[in-house]
Design a protein with these regions (language model features):
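Elongated alpha-helical scaffolds that mediate protein-protein interactions in large eukaryotic proteins
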Residues: 1-2
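Short cysteine/histidine-rich metal-coordination sites, predominantly Zn2+-binding motifs
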Residues: 80-88, 98-106
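C-terminal motif of bacterial Sec signal peptides marking the signal peptidase cleavage site
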Residues: 5-9
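N-terminal pre-ligand scaffold of iron-sulfur
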Residues: 12-78, 105-122
């Protein structure tokens, strides 16, 4: 393994930026496992994504993998932000870094609603 291969993916602060993730899944909003999405501010975690209902008609989906060192991030409905427990990184609901060591934004996925089926794709 070459030195370049070892350093590939490392950021200037010693973290690593996870590779872009490809997702393509659906959530049935009538399923009990997705009942949190019936309420504005509700969220579910599925398929390496956090899916949040932000308004009556709007859902967002972001990667749940921190861009610093790959830890799993969590959504705080009270703070309305996304938090990494490993080193305190924070992101807004657009995936942008708002604090801490993450070197880049979270990957944002597309959402589309057809009846009670929410589709999430990269």
């Amino acid at each position: 393994m070459t030195g370049a291969s070892i350093l590939e993916g490392c950021s200037k602060n010693g973290g690593s930026t996870p590779a872009t993730v490809s997702v393509n899944f659906t959530l049935d909003l009538n399923a009990s496992s997705n009942s949190a999405l019936k309420t504005v501010g509700g969220y579910v975690e599925s398929n390496n994504a956090i899916v949040i209902r932000t308004t009556t008609n709007t859902y967002i989906a972001l990667s749940n993998v921190c861009t610093h060192q790959g830890c799993t991030v969590s959504y705080s409905s009270q703070a309305k932000d996304i938090y990494c427990p490993c080193h305190g990184g924070t992101y807004d609901l657009n995936g942008n870094v708002t604090g801490g060591p993450p070197p880049s934004a979270l990957q944002v996925f597309k959402t589309s609603l057809n009846g009670n089926i929410l589709t999430v794709t990269s």
